[in-house]
Amino acid sequence: MWGLQPPTSIPPPPPPTELTPSTYPAMVNGYPPPAASAQSCSSSGGQSELYMPLQRVMAPTGGRNSIKYRDYTPCRNTTKLFYVDNKASDIDTYNKDANHSNFRTTVIHNQDLDADTAATESIQLDNRSCWGGDLKTAVRTNCPNVSSFFQSNSVRVRMMWKRDPPTSTAPPSAVGSGYSVPGAQYKWYDLTVPEGNYALCELIDLLNEGIVQLYLSEGRQNNVQKSDIGVKFDTRNFGLLRDPVTGLVTPGTYVYKGYHPDIVLLPGCAIDFTYSRLSLLLGIGKREPYSKGFVITYEDLQGGDIPALLDLDSVDVNDADGEVIELDNAAPLLHDSAGVSYNVIYDQVTGKPVTAYRSWMLAYNVPNSQANQTTLLTVPDMAGGIGAMYTSLPDTFIAPTGFKEDNTTNLCPVVGMNLFPTYNKIYYQAASTYVQRLENSCQSATAAFNRFPENEILKQAPPMNVSSVCDNQPAVVQQGVLPVKSSLPGLQRVLITDDQRRPIPYVYKSIATVQPTVLSSATLQ
């Protein structure tokens, strides 16, 4: 009997084998199929209305990319989570004692829910998939370059605080054999500069004013003379116009032009940058930056003796131009017009008169000197030498490799990193010395920053034409994809720390977005 067979384009199921039974049950998305099973199809002659593929083929579908929130329709494939630091509802509820770098915020922005209710909600990512989140952060800062928080407003200095009374108040009349002060006693002081955002020349003025204040507060009352002030910050090159025969600076004055920050020391004095970033602002670094301690002493400046000035009254000029002098009559200038000594002594190596002051700049430029081997001349970093900025979202991301889950402030896993967004802006200002004189005359600043205008060593340091300022710029960083948790609580913690893992008080705006997406299956092998 010729009967019509039901048409079908579905291929027959694979024949069952008795030796290796199928390890995959005839299921679709975990439910029995509406059609006959493979066994019943084979027993009925292979006529099946629906071909059932193995469960592994159908497994990746069926909601494995769903993002669910409450009873709303699931969102497929991806979404975006927003982290904002100054939501009014969050401030009133969770962040009364927080700041922009350590706060909590709700990522559920449902206008029908208050902050308390939104914090109890959660966003569910299908746990059959491995999810990753693309993190993008944006931070704005208002950080000054001199602050106590970043250890850039103080430095330790060693100065004379006591000595025997001088036997005579008259200025010196002859070159000394060496620098020796009867009964001199030294001790360490903490030199602190007011916090602020300064240009380089302003910072040097404040440092020198701090040195004078230390002298006035204790040294002056204990017989310490002005010529015994043994720490000075300067910018000049004291070796310019030094006569190679006499060893004296022939004009009788040092060239009043700034080139690079410098440190001037007397015997027994020192400066300690161990716990200060001011060395970075001054452009004085370490050859071995990871070695412990950073102290510059007078002995470290071997070869940096500041040459003595030529006493113009001691020479007999015999030509019309006034450039040729009688060498036999050349003598060093022993004191300034106010009678303050220049501490002129004889160099033990050359026998020529020099001052007892030593300059770091001069010592650094002597080949193979100790200053050249242990320190490094760098561009002054007026950004404060601040390091890195770390972002942590402990309630969103799974701890990256190398971290463990922790919600402690200084132990939160790091999921984002970038340089601190302060930048050293270099500019050129022509005739900066003229501008300095104009400012001093108009603002009565001479008494504050140029207390010893007659003394060529202690006078105000000239500004540099090439100088620097600190500038804060927004930092927008694409941090990349990291694994996120499958259950995201509505209340999230955001933490932005410095390289010591402390919340940064100078962050005044921080926002972030996380875009989750499926990376792989969490159930398939």
UniProtKB/Swiss-Prot annotation:
Q: What are the alphabetically sorted keywords of the record?
A: Capsid protein, Host nucleus, Host-virus interaction, Late protein, T=25 icosahedral capsid protein, Viral attachment to host cell, Viral penetration into host cytoplasm, Virion, Virus endocytosis by host, Virus entry into host cell
Q: What top-level branch of life does the organism fall under?
A: Viruses
Q: Where is the composition biased (Low complexity)?
A: 36-47
**What turns on this gene?**
Expressed in the late phase of the viral replicative cycle.
Residue ranges for the region (Disordered) are 1-47
UniProt xrefs under InterPro entries? Adeno_Penton_B
> Where in or outside the cell is it found?
Virion; Host nucleus
Mention one GO biological process in which this protein takes part, according to its record. endocytosis involved in viral entry into host cell
Per UniProt, what is one GO molecular function of this protein?
Answer: structural molecule activity
Q: Where is the composition biased (Pro residues)?
A: 8-18
One cellular component (GO) term of this entry? T=25 icosahedral viral capsid
User: Matching Pfam families, A to Z?
Assistant: Adeno_Penton_B
Any extra remark in the record? All late proteins expressed from the major late promoter are produced by alternative splicing and alternative polyadenylation of the same gene giving rise to non-overlapping ORFs. A leader sequence is present in the N-terminus of all these mRNAs and is recognized by the viral shutoff protein to provide expression although conventional translation via ribosome scanning from the cap has been shut off in the host cell.
Function (record text): Major capsid protein that self-associates to form penton base pentamers, each in the shape of a pentagon, situated at the 12 vertices of the pseudo T=25 capsid. Involved in virus secondary attachment to host cell after initial attachment by the fiber protein, and in endocytosis of virions. As the virus enters the host cell, penton proteins are shed concomitant with virion acidification in the endosome.
Provide the assembly information.
Answer: Interacts with the fiber protein (via N-terminal tail region). Interacts with the capsid vertex protein; this interaction binds the penton base to neighboring peripentonal hexons.
Name the family the entry cites: Belongs to the adenoviridae penton family.
Q: What is the protein name given in its UniProt record?
A: Penton protein
Native organism is Fowl adenovirus C serotype 10 (strain SA2)
